[in-house]
């Protein structure tokens, strides 16, 4: 992964004063990397600042690795639009990047009449969203598709698939890098300041770094290592998007953290499951524990969901893991404890109604009072599926 070897900067009191960029993207998760790749198509000088030492160290890699169909998301929302678009184009994207992907399809299984009605409701919603090919199947057909699925009936979603979200993010970032984007790791953003042209602050900036023209307003983005300058700043900081957004001048967006735990099953179990098996959505359209094969031959069982306050609260809880076993066995009856080889945690930061906690849509915010800034907040599931369509929307604002 490229980290600019020649930072072309001046140094003052131990702080590196960077060259000027057209665009700075904050965050090298899957969405930030997709934005960087999209912007690399244009004649823009772009940098990505990431607080960790590699891409996708946060929740971009702490998920099921599912290419979602888009049938549970509310019609007309950004989440629904980008999920369906991202799904439809993913074969092409995966081929361009050379990353592993299998369009396996997915079974959404049910046990009760209530499950059946919920599945039918979300099937109709998916069709309205543009999801193609969904069909209801009885137990016999369900077991022809996946012999080891639990359930009495199912909806088959042929457009769903599986991928490695870490390799996918690496592919996006490497492609951006090959096209000239600079990635700076270990670069935690500590401050963002707008500097107007023809002001004392701009004069001081030019004095510190004479390569700056000073003919247009700039943003000074300070990290623990250096000061970066750019005409545009894009916030794609994931769990820290609210914090970065407030540094930029955006108001706080009400959110809650939703923590989910997973079991990873040995590849010996992988031979028994070739297609993801999900439970019927609940009344709100959310899923609980499901069983999903990985592109490497393991199986992921999870997640459960409970609230958390910590953006990096990745500790497991025994009671949650016990529940995963019980719930996961309903989806995948061949699951057994000897297959468990490790566990991990992911966290969704959901935009929500501050009173009811109703989950709200993805946000791509702009503000006329903070020109040349874009703030993406609450990009949780299906963020991996939606990453490239989100990136196109960001580029359309900027260009």
Predicted segments with their positions:
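Glycine-rich FAD pyrophosphate-binding loop
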Residues: 41-61
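Helical element adjacent to the flavin cofactor pocket in flavoenzyme catalytic cores
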Residues: 155-231, 388
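Short beta-strand to alpha-helix junction loop
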Residues: 79-84, 109-118, 156-174, 184, ...
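N-terminal Rossmann-like FAD-binding beta1-loop-alpha1 element of flavoenzymes
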Residues: 21-48
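Glycine-rich phosphate/pyrophosphate-binding beta-alpha loops
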Residues: 72, 160-162, 282, 286, ...
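Active-site substrate-recognition segment that forms the wall
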Residues: 37-38, 97-102, 227, 235-371
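C-terminal lid/capping helical subdomain adjacent to the catalytic/cofactor pocket in oxidative enzymes
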Residues: 14, 34, 362-399
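Dinucleotide-binding Rossmann-like beta1-alpha1 core, especially the glycine-rich loop
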Residues: 65-145, 151, 288-290
């Amino acid at each position: 992964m490229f980290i600019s070897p020649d930072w072309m900067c001046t140094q003052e009191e131990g702080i590196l004063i960077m060259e000027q960029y057209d665009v700075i993207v904050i965050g090298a998760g899957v969405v930030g990397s997709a934005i960087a790749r999209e912007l690399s198509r244009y004649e823009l000088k772009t940098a990505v600042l990431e607080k960790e030492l590699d891409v996708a160290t946060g929740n971009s890699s702490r998920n099921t690795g599912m290419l979602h169909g888009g049938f549970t998301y509310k019609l007309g929302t950004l989440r629904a639009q980008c999920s369906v678009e991202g799904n439809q184009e993913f074969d092409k994207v995966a081929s361009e990047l050379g990353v592993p992907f299998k369009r396996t399809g997915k079974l959404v299984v049910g046990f009760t009449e209530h499950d059946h009605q919920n599945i039918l409701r979300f099937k109709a919603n998916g069709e309205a969203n543009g999801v193609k090919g969904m069909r209801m199947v009885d137990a016999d057909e369900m077991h022809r598709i996946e012999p080891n699925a639990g359930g009495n009936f199912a909806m088959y979603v042929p457009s769903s698939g599986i991928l490695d979200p870490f390799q996918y993010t690496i592919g996006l970032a490497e492609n951006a890098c090959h096209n000239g984007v600079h990635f700076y790791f270990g670069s935690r953003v500590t401050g963002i300041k707008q500097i107007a042209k023809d002001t004392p602050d701009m004069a001081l900036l030019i004095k510190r770094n004479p390569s700056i023209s000073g003919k247009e307003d700039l943003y000074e983005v300070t990290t623990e290592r250096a000061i970066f300058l750019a005409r545009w700043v894009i916030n794609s900081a994931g769990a820290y998007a609210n914090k970065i957004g407030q540094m930029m001048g955006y108001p706080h967006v009400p959110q809650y953290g939703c923590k989910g735990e997973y079991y990873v099953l040995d590849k010996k179990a992988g031979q028994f499951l070739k297609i993801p098996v999900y439970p019927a959505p609940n009344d709100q359209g959310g899923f609980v524990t499901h069983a999903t094969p990985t592109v490497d031959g393991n199986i992921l069982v999870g997640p459960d969901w409970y609230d958390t306050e910590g953006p990096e609260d990745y500790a497991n809880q025994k009671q949650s893991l016990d529940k995963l076993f019980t719930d996961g066995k309903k989806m995948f009856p061949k699951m057994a404890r000897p297959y468990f080889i490790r566990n991990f945690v992911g966290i969704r930061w959901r935009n929500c109604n501050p009173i009811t906690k109703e989950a709200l849509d993805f946000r791509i915010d702009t503000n006329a009072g903070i020109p040349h800034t874009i703030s993406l907040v609450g990009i949780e599931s299906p963020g991996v599926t939606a990453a490239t369509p989100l990136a196109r929307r960001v580029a359309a604002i900027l260009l």
